[in-house]
Amino acid sequence: MYNTTNEFLIESAEINLLVTEGLADKSKKMFATVIKKIKEFIRKVLMYIKSKLVNKIKSVDKNIKTAKANETETETLEEPITLANSKKLDELLDSVETVLKTAKEVSLSVAQKYSLLSDSELDEFHDTITNNYETLESLYEKYKDDIDETYTKIPPSIYDAYGKTNRKCSDITGNISECAWRLDDAIKAISDSTDDTIAKRMQIITKTQATITKAITVAEFITNSCNRSITNLY
């Protein structure tokens, strides 16, 4: 089981490398290795969400209740305080939702319409999920070191804003899990195939697992940002 999202990034990179090597030599053995690796990746994703990410989301809710009980929201601050910008957090979440929606649709299509997909359709699927992934990646790179702002007064309804963001994170974990299951279905659909488009399908599947990795990374970043900000308030 993964202990940090960095481990997701490492394994995702390993899968990408294996696929690149497999495409180069068209080795069935290599593709079998990739399929096994992605299946294990899916299992670890589901376990991480259940054992790590869900608990972090619960921790945010708990800390919001504690902060509200201390009634710090109406206090004048003696010193400036650094808090995560809730609008930036929500913008990141919107991008995560978009890329996961695309990933689920693509995985479902690969799994259910295996014999019907043309080369052009596969190319379109790959381009769409790649574009959405790159948009999320760009936004995350933009905000990950610039998510905080300094406040001299506690913003009105800040706890409600973080609570809303945290609930969206909770919904995101469900979307990630669903995406992982659909990816598993797509893997099963190509496992025993000899179709000559398997290389393109494998590229789509690989980009989908990379999307899941990025979604978890961003969701955890948002949850951690909420938690850190709330604990700064009491």
Annotate each PLM feature.
Residues A13, E21-G22, S27, K50, ...:
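Generic low-complexity, intrinsically disordered sequence content enriched
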Residues K62-Y234:
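Long, low-complexity or tandemly repetitive, helically biased scaffold regions used
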Residues A24, K28-I35, K39, R43-L46, ...:
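Membrane-interacting alpha-helical segments
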Residues Y2-K26, A32:
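Proteolytic processing junctions in secreted/extracellular precursors
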